């Protein structure tokens, strides 16, 4: 039945920035949830409604992969249950290892099989056929979330067992729940919702069970909260504006430079790289803003994922501001288990590089992603060594110089992140260093014609594209470096007439762009 309904509707697109989502799916999901909260006799029905709505949202992309998501949820919950119940501790560790291997294998099969086959054929001159697998949507995200859950379940049990033994030896009542009480239908629904909750399912933020599951249990979140709805609408409007007005239109410049041009002059290359740097930021942060806003409709507070990353004065500061939830995962579940800062300095550098190599490879199966991760790992190691030197010699770099170095490194590294292959990356980099000539002229005739063609198809031509390059750059600079970011507005938890007016204006402009142009997917859907 579900497959039939979805197949009929597949002519439409179910993305945050589409009319079908904004005017149909979201209102139905919202109303259904709070109606059930108010009138359902069984308190599990509202949670079940959200789980089913989230699964429908996921299945809309490709219903064939719905069993994969459901199977992953059931399997990981079962493994966590066995970790909780099994004695002795050695068997707990075996269940944890089994769960980790299964999750990594599932992700590796879909994401990296073709990459390894291609490179194996290249090295050994063999002719194994690639499988041309379609990457299941969100698999990189829900896999990480469940890996963290398994590891934390294991660590929590390691802490609980000595405490329980201590209580027994003291002949005191055991306050901790016995292992058999771990499973319940309510707890399973909380877990399923933690993994599948549709605002964050597809591209994050990478949520942690400790910050999500208690919110699903909180009875105060079961009632309509008009302040949360108003604030959520405001944050959603910011994200929608970032996506459809800025990111989608900046993409035209980046796509031309990376995919269409055969060579790039100095100005063209820098315009290409900067366009992608801002496109990626506004696209991904726009998605996260929209996810946070939607979460607030349901009284669920998702973690902040961006904090003005392009204002960073060093690469460490950048990773405290960019994709914050991924940085948290890499730190807590890779860097610290490898020794963190407690090991010898050379080992710390090795760990930094290794962690970011894995982080780069997590983003995509390609040498360009590996190089991007390697560059960031090396940069973090260099920054760490530099920080030690500055403390020793009492030297401080001027802030403007520190910002210029940091931003330009980030912009350069994004070239590898965006390029389809090394040849495309080198094409842009050659232009950026002036190997194709340093010219202060306008874009080539081909690029100009392309931009003019884009302009003619836009309703907002007279407002936004009278001088496309200049006005878009001014808008991006103002938003990125001058205005308060959405995380500050989110944390303020207050609505006033300025925010209300801004939300109405941003939504109006966003809707104009939605109906004036074709919808595009979010960039991080590809990862």
Curated annotation (Swiss-Prot):
Family from the record: Belongs to the membrane-bound acyltransferase family.
Gene Ontology MF: a single term: acyltransferase activity
Chain's role: Catalyzes the O-acetylation of peptidoglycan (PG), an important mechanism that appears to confer lysozyme resistance and contributes to pathogen persistence in the host.
Membrane topology value: Multi-pass membrane protein
Membrane-spanning segments: 11-31, 55-75, 96-116, 131-151, 187-207, 228-248, 280-300, 352-372, 397-417, 463-483, 505-525
Group of enzyme by EC: transferase
Record GO biological process: alginic acid biosynthetic process; cell wall organization
Organism of this sequence: Helicobacter pylori (strain ATCC 700392 / 26695)
Observed phenotype of the null mutant: Cells lacking this gene contain a greatly reduced amount of acetylated muropeptides in the bacterial PG, and are more susceptible to lysozyme killing than wild-type.
Claim: Transmembrane is one of the keywords in the record: yes
Enzyme nomenclature, EC number: 2.3.1.-
Name the record gives this protein: Peptidoglycan O-acetyltransferase
Active-site residues, as the UniProt record annotates them: 363
Record keywords: Acyltransferase, Cell membrane, Cell wall biogenesis/degradation, Membrane, Transferase, Transmembrane, Transmembrane helix
């Amino acid at each position: 039945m579900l497959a039939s309904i979805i197949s009929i509707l597949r002519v439409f697109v179910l993305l945050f920035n589409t009319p079908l989502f904004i005017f149909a799916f979201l209102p139905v999901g919202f109303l259904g949830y709070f109606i059930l909260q108010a009138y359902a006799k069984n308190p599990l029905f509202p949670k079940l409604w959200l789980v089913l709505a989230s699964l429908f949202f996921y299945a809309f992309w490709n219903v064939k992969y719905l069993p994969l998501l459901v199977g992953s949820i059931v399997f990981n919950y079962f493994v966590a249950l066995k970790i909780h119940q099994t004695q002795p501790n050695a068997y707990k560790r075996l269940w944890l290892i089994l769960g980790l291997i299964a999750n990594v294998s599932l992700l590796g099969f879909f994401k990296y099989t073709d990459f390894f086959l291609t490179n194996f054929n290249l090295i050994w001159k063999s002719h194994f056929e690639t499988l041309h697998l379609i990457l299941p949507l969100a698999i990189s995200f829900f896999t990480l979330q469940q890996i963290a859950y398994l590891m934390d379940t294991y660590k929590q049990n390691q802490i609980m067992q000595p405490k329980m033994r201590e209580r027994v030896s003291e002949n005191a009542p055991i306050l901790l729940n016995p292992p058999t009480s771990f499973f319940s239908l309510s707890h399973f629904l909380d877990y399923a919702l933690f993994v599948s909750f549709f605002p964050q399912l597809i591209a994050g933020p990478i949520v942690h069970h400790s910050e999500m599951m208690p919110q699903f249990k909180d009875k105060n979140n079961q009632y309509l909260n008009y302040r949360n709805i108003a604030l959520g609408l405001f944050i959603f409007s910011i994200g929608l504006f970032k996506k459809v007005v800025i990111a989608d239109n900046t993409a035209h410049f980046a796509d031309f430079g990376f995919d269409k041009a055969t060579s790039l002059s100095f100005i063209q290359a820098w315009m290409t790289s900067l366009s992608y740097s801002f496109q990626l930021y506004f696209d991904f942060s726009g998605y996260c803003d929209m996810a946070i806003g939607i979460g607030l409709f349901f009284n669920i507070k998702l973690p902040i994922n961006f904090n003005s990353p392009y204002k960073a004065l060093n690469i460490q500061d950048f990773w405290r501001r960019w994709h914050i939830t991924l940085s948290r995962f890499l730190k807590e579940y890779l860097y610290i288990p490898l020794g963190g800062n407690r090991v010898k300095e050379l080992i710390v550098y090795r760990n930094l590089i290794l962690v970011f190599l894995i982080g780069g490879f997590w983003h995509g199966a390609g040498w360009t992603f590996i190089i991007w991760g390697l560059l960031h790992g090396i940069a973090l190691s260099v920054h760490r060594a530099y920080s030690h030197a500055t403390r020793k010699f009492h030297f401080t770099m001027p802030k403007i110089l520190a910002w210029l170095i940091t931003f330009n490194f980030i912009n350069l590294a994004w070239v590898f992140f965006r390029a389809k292959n090394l040849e495309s990356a080198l094409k842009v980099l050659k232009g950026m260093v002036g190997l194709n000539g340093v010219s202060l002229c306008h874009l080539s005739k081909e690029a100009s014609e392309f931009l003019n063609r884009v302009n003619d198809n836009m309703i907002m031509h007279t407002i936004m594209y009278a001088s496309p390059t200049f006005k878009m750059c001014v808008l991006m600079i103002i938003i990125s470096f001058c205005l308060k970011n959405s995380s500050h507005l989110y944390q303020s938890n207050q609505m006033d007439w300025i925010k209300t007016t801004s939300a109405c204006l941003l939504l109006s402009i966003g809707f104009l762009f939605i109906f004036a142009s074709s919808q595009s997917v979010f960039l991080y859907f590809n990862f």
